[in-house]
Swiss-Prot record:
CDD domains (UniProt xref): GT9_LPS_heptosyltransferase
An example Gene Ontology CC term for this record: cytosol
Source domain of life: Bacteria
Protein name: Putative glycosyltransferase HI_0523
Coiled coil stretches, renumbered: none
Record organism: Haemophilus influenzae (strain ATCC 51907 / DSM 11121 / KW20 / Rd)
GO molecular function, one term: ADP-heptose-lipopolysaccharide heptosyltransferase activity
Amino acid sequence: MEKILVIRNDKLGDFMQAWPAFAMLKASNPKLKLTALVPSYTASLAEICPFIDHVIIDSKKNDKTDFKRLVQEIKAQQFDGMISFFSNTHNGKLAWKSGIKYRLAPATKWVQILYNHRLTQRRSRSEKSEAEYNQDLVRTFLQKHNMPVVEPKPPYLIFEKSAVENQRVFLQENLGLSANKKWIFVHSGSGGSATNLSLAQYADLIKGLLAEFDCNVVLTAGPGESEKAYELANLVNDLRVAIYDKNKGLVDFAHSLACADLFIAGSTGPLHLSSAFNIPTIGFYPNSRSSQPRRWKPINDVDKHIAFCPPAGKESQMNLELISIDNALAEISLFIRNMWQTSNNI
């Protein structure tokens, strides 16, 4: 058992939640060769993942010709095994048609019959985080093949020091940031997959932080989110706020996130990407069972993340406007001071 296909072909945040599982595979058996099946959107990140050796681009949705291309590409690699961290009809058919002898996936829905090894997880109960569910699959794989289980630790992504320093200089020059201040990155967009605070709430949060900490706040924005970032900047109306809405792709964006001293967002891809660097993070979540903080906590150290959500209950669980920013600021202020350790630079 050496050549393994690992599948996490959904969104950015979901993909990042699989990195500890990739790390566990490599740490437990460095001889394993991991090939990741990912969509084109996250392929560039997969290529810089230190635990992934090769990348295969997933087929286009509902494109039968491209699906056949993908099946042939996988067959040609002659994998010894596969782990699908995310199972749907597409992945199930792919597993079956690829002819890989060892096929492991969560035991969910009818598609589980297309895998010959399954792990009952009941993820819908959200008793663990997505990253922990992914690692449980890896533990099952390792134990089945008599390989020792080595638990991974963050950070899961480290850039060369010079690369981060160069990116800091670039951001200083282009965004007008101070080299002597801490940098708080705030992502107010939702990416289409998660509810988030209102712009008014984010403005109150940022104003509260700037009143206590003399830092720079960088407003990040993904495709189609620039207008909201500018609106938020106008609401805050502080010269220490800058907008970062242009980059050269996910890898370039990741280099900028590596420069942050703190990252604040809803439960979105950028939150999970930033946590791979083990920088402090603050998240705002819905309180439904499938979206709550426990299920989608990021992959940095436990003590480097705090989360807020609205009260439980059908009428309130999805309404993040019920989160009190004044109450959150008290906890956030203490968290920041603990993370930054000293008041000399704030």
